[in-house]
Amino acid sequence: MGKAHATPQLLFGGTFNPVHNGHLVSAMAAREALGVDSVTLLPCYVPPHKTAPTIAAEHRLAMLQHVVQENNHLCIDTCELDAGESIFTVDTLAAKRELWGASASIIWLIGWDSLHNLSRWHRWQSLLTFANLAVVERPFAQSDDINSLPPAVRNWLQQHRVSAKQLTQQANGGVALLHTPRIELSSSDVRQRLGAQKSIQYMVPACVETYIRAHKLYTH
């Protein structure tokens, strides 16, 4: 675990298929909880054989670009899209560590569901070698929630858990549970409603809905 000497870099990865208000509430709440300047969105590459309904990466990126234009606390990193292939999170973080140096505080933002399934991630125990993790948590989470985690993840969390403030002061090695609003919304919810020709108002930013309608996305 190293002490940080640079502006913390808060990274939020996902397919963003499409980006929705749940993503944005989580990103902004995490930014405030950690006291950082901005959140970098990292859209991931989606293989063409993936069974879930997907759209071209250019559309997913375009929707993010529209969102970023309306929020100066958000920016986009296309490193995974540019690679043109699936990249494990641990490899992305290793590359960022090499790029930014040993003293940069790198924070990868995940949801509670991702924490619960973390032991299924490729080389999950190596994630903290390169970065910190911030977990978007329910605002009134109880100790029972932590006890419900798989034993390996729960023990790992107990060993590495720090406060939000500590997280931004160290380069890597910590995990913070953030008390942030929780919105029960997913990209699949949005896609299903679009496929059923139902309204998605208030589920996505207006600029995203306009783009989806203009390009007739997720209609099948």
UniProtKB/Swiss-Prot annotation:
Its EC number is 2.7.7.18. InterPro entries: Cyt_trans-like (IPR004821), NadD/NMNAT (IPR005248), Rossmann-like_a/b/a_fold (IPR014729). SUPFAM superfamilies: Nucleotidylyl transferase (SSF52374). The keyword Nucleotide-binding applies. It comes from the Bacteria. Pathway: Cofactor biosynthesis; NAD(+) biosynthesis; deamido-NAD(+) from nicotinate D-ribonucleotide: step 1/1. It is an enzyme of class 2 (transferase). Keywords: ATP-binding, NAD, Nucleotide-binding, Nucleotidyltransferase, Pyridine nucleotide biosynthesis, Transferase. Disulfide bonds: none annotated. GO terms for biological process: NAD biosynthetic process. Belongs to the NadD family. This is Probable nicotinate-nucleotide adenylyltransferase. It comes from Saccharophagus degradans (strain 2-40 / ATCC 43961 / DSM 17024).
